[in-house]
Amino acid sequence: MPIAVLALGITQITAWGTSFYCLGVLAGPISQDTHWSRGFVFLGFTVALLVMGVVSSAVGRTIDRRGARVVMTLGSVLVAGGLFALAHVHSEPAYLAVWAFLGVGMRMCLYDAAFAALVQVAPSRGRTAISYLTLFGAFASSVFWVVGHALNQRVGWRQTLVLFAFMNLAVCLPLHWLGLSRREAPRGEATPTGGPAPSREDPPLEGRTRSRAIVLFALVMSLNGFVFGVVSVQLVPLLEAAGLATAAAVWVASLKGVAQFGGRVVEMLFGRKLRAITVARIAVGVLPPSLLLLMVGPASLSLVVAFTLLMGASQGVITIVRGAVPLALFGSKDYGAVLGAIATPVLIVNAASPSLFAWITDRWGWGTGRMSLLAGAALAWLAMEIMSHWYEARHREGVSASPAHATATPRRRDARPR
């Protein structure tokens, strides 16, 4: 597993940085060179997210059938081809079409595919591997915004995208193919005494119960996706509307990445002692109070910093939860298809949320906009609590009805080992 985590860690930094985050530093140069509005430039990214949502279930099923190794390797080829094509577009329709093509490749390369790959490579250690992998991903924007800015200064945005395409072929493609070539047989994690460790999670859900749980968890992630979709694009304007000057808003917004990384480290150190669904309840539950900090009166720097740190930590842990909870509730069987089904509404909401939030603030102001974020976070928390209590009740019913529970008898006091 360490080889797979390291390989995927490198590819996640590269794939996220060169595709998902590339407009962070290249949108301005593209707009200036082509005379397209920045809004139109970012519309391409919205198209990619929508396509990712549309193809998500199909990609997930293909990962289960063909293996993540094949899908992610092909995804590297598609991302490279899309970036190369993007470097040569000169018309608006072609620009949007290339982003649609990139959306397919991105869905085959980014977190959901990588989570499924780790579960296929190391079924017994999937949750731990997912936690480690997200630590790598936290550096993607930091690394490639610097790299992209430097390359654009030297060779321009078109050649920068060509170099990004080459990185996907030279780095991601071989690492996906070679790093995912070995799988361990499913087994329990070893204890210090050498025996299998008892599972911290309950048996996977089946049948109608499984379907209902998938719908509930997809609802939780979609409601959170609305909040994080807005924050990812409009955090600086949100902080400015709270009363910060632009320079201060940019500085505070930069703390979000630090908080994401910190949240993931805390989950790795302490979250292993908790069930995945418990970690999810904590991460989802932190978000509404953090948003309240923006609404308690005149904003102070300390309150805004506290909001950013809590929100960032929540987002960082929820990235892990998105892969760990389905593994705990539904098991490794058809894991790729389950992630694909959950990701479909999440990605579509992510794509639509910045525009929807902009419409809300333009029509009713920033106060109503903040209320919409709080409502989304509160509904996500409520849905998470309903899901958790429902799941616990179903589990207790299953345990009390199980033959082992009904027929178990205590060992006689006078029994002797033979």
Segments and roles (model prediction):
Residues 30-31, 62-63, 146-155, 239-240, ...:
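Interfacial helix-cap and linker-helix signal at transmembrane-aqueous boundaries
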Residues 159-178, 370-388:
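Symmetry-related core transmembrane helices of the 12-TM Major Facilitator Superfamily/SLC fold
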Residues 256, 274-325:
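C-terminal transmembrane helical hairpin of 12-TM major facilitator-type secondary transporters
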Residues 13, 82, 93-109, 222, ...:
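Hydrophobic core of transmembrane alpha-helices in multi-pass small-molecule transporters
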Residues 55-67, 263-276, 361-362:
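Helix-to-loop junctions at the C-terminal end of transmembrane segments
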Residues 54-92:
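Conserved MFS/SLC helix-loop-helix module at the cytosolic interface between two early adjacent transmembrane helices
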Residues 23-27, 210-262:
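Extracytoplasmic gate region of multi-pass secondary transporters
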Residues 30, 108-122, 317-330:
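Intracellular juxtamembrane helix-capping segments at the cytosolic ends
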